[in-house]
Curated annotation (Swiss-Prot):
Gene: psmA6
Functional summary from the UniProt entry: The proteasome is a multicatalytic proteinase complex which is characterized by its ability to cleave peptides with Arg, Phe, Tyr, Leu, and Glu adjacent to the leaving group at neutral or slightly basic pH. The proteasome has an ATP-dependent proteolytic activity.
Pfam family, one: Proteasome_A_N
Gene Ontology CC: one annotated term: nucleus
Compartments in which it is found: Cytoplasm; Nucleus
Protein name: Proteasome subunit alpha type-6
Keywords: Cytoplasm, Nucleus, Proteasome
Record note on quaternary structure: The 26S proteasome consists of a 20S proteasome core and two 19S regulatory subunits. The 20S proteasome core is composed of 28 subunits that are arranged in four stacked rings, resulting in a barrel-shaped structure. The two end rings are each formed by seven alpha subunits, and the two central rings are each formed by seven beta subunits. The catalytic chamber with the active sites is on the inside of the barrel.
Protein species of origin: Dictyostelium discoideum
Length: 250
């Protein structure tokens, strides 16, 4: 976008004559600059998030690089976008979870947390002294009444529930791939889902849109199931097992 076209309206949170908030548009573009792609898929008995893992330097300890965050024992998220913004938003989410539990005496439901994080993000679109976060949060958890839950919170302060969603560099390609999968297999959204199928689908989505065979060191996967309800980050050994199952299917 040319500077002459924005006429200074992109310098702060202020509407242009065309009704646009350029800082928000730039925040959405910033999500893609990290070069990572993440997906989330919800079934009847579980919900899964998967994302790429890239180590920017050979001397960095791989264990210190992550896009997956455990917000409570029962809720987790994958953050896609600018890394410092991701850490800041995840830290705030953990704080909100703790505050809710202290105030009400029970764990915060996934939809309540998603709405709260969206409200906080939306505040950054109202003040000239603030800027939107360049990150998309895909949040998962198990609701006591509604079962598996999958939400995405964007820089504009919008949160939406999904059957499947994506974020990052290959967001549109991943969305198209998932739409075809759900169209060809509508049972995913109606009947009981085997959690292995969701994990394999998440991996195959990333491999398809990236055009590469991924190793366990290239992936991070988190899952919540109706069995134990807790958010679990899969180990490299578990991911290797799923990659083997995917290879056998192909």
């Amino acid at each position: 976008m040319s500077r002459s076209g924005t006429a200074g309206y992109d310098m702060s949170i202020i509407f242009s004559p065309q009704g646009k908030l350029y800082q928000i548009e730039y925040a959405f573009k910033a999500i893609k600059t990290g070069g990572l792609t993440s997906v989330g898929i919800r079934g009847k008995d579980c919900v899964v998030v998967a994302t790429q893992k890239k180590i920017p330097d050979k001397l960095i300890d791989p264990k210190s690089v992550t896009s997956l965050y455990k917000l409570t024992d029962y809720i987790g998220c994958v953050q896609t976008g600018i890394v410092p913004d991701s850490k800041s938003q995840a830290s705030r989410a953990i704080q909100e979870c703790a505050t809710f539990h202290h105030k009400f005496g029970y764990q915060i439901p996934p939809n309540v947390l998603a709405k709260r994080m969206a409200d906080i993000a939306q505040l950054s679109t109202q003040h000239a002294s603030a800027r939107p976060l360049g990150v998309a949060m895909i949040l998962i958890g198990i609701d006591d009444e509604l079962g598996p839950q999958l939400f995405k919170v964007d820089p504009a302060g919008v949160f939406t529930g999904y059957k499947a969603t994506a974020a990052g560099e290959k967001e549109q390609e991943s969305t198209n791939f998932l739409e075809k999968k759900f169209k060809s297999n509508p049972q995913l959204s109606k009947d009981e889902t085997i959690q292995v199928s969701l994990i394999v689908m998440a991996i195959s989505t990333l491999q398809s849109v990236l055009g590469a065979d991924l190793k366990s060191s290239d992936l991070e996967i988190g899952i919540c199931t109706m069995d134990n309800r807790k958010f679990v980050i899969m180990t490299d050994e578990d991911i290797d097992s799923q990659l083997t199952k995917l290879a056998e299917r192909d």
